[in-house]
Curated annotation (Swiss-Prot):
The lineage of its organism: Eukaryota, Metazoa, Chordata, Craniata, Vertebrata. Its main location: secreted. GO terms for cellular component: extracellular region. The keyword Acyltransferase does not apply. Keywords: Amidation, Amphibian defense peptide, Antibiotic, Antimicrobial, Secreted. This is Dermaseptin-J5. It comes from Phasmahyla jandaia. GO terms for biological process: defense response to bacterium. Expressed by the skin glands.
Amino acid sequence: GLWSKIKEAGKAAVKAAGKAALGAVANSV
């Protein structure tokens, strides 16, 4: 349903944010 889609989108956003944060840290070193 709609709620599961929202939850999946949230998980994807968290994953993307985590990857971006890791990338920023790696690039700043």
